[in-house]
Amino acid sequence: MKKVLIYSRTGCHLCEIAIDKINSVRNEKNFQVEIKLIDRIHDLEEKYGEQVPVIFIDEKIHDYWRVDLERFIKDINT
């Protein structure tokens, strides 16, 4: 089963949209999702703070800012 990790920040509107899109295909495509708030994790906040949401699939960066759902599904299926 694939694992999706989303770096997010409190109050991030783009993060909410990305999470909703990813969750909309979660049951159909059968993958795990973890959402990690990076607000108080200095090294992650410094590295990714301006790029959230950051989406990883199986520990590899998939996307920043917005989710292209078609590409996401393609990558989840491979």
Enumerate the predicted regions with their spans.
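Short, Lys/Arg-enriched, disordered terminal segments
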Residues: 1-3, 75-78
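Local sequence-structure signature of Cys/Sec-based thiol-disulfide redox active-site neighborhoods
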Residues: 1-24
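Surface-exposed interaction regions that form or flank ligand-binding interfaces
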Residues: 48
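Thiol-based oxidoreductase modules, predominantly thioredoxin-like and allied folds used
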Residues: 31-42
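A short, hydrophobic beta-strand/beta-hairpin element that forms part of a small beta-sheet core
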Residues: 53-60
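A short, Lys/Arg-enriched amphipathic alpha-helix followed by its capping loop at the start of a domain
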Residues: 25-29
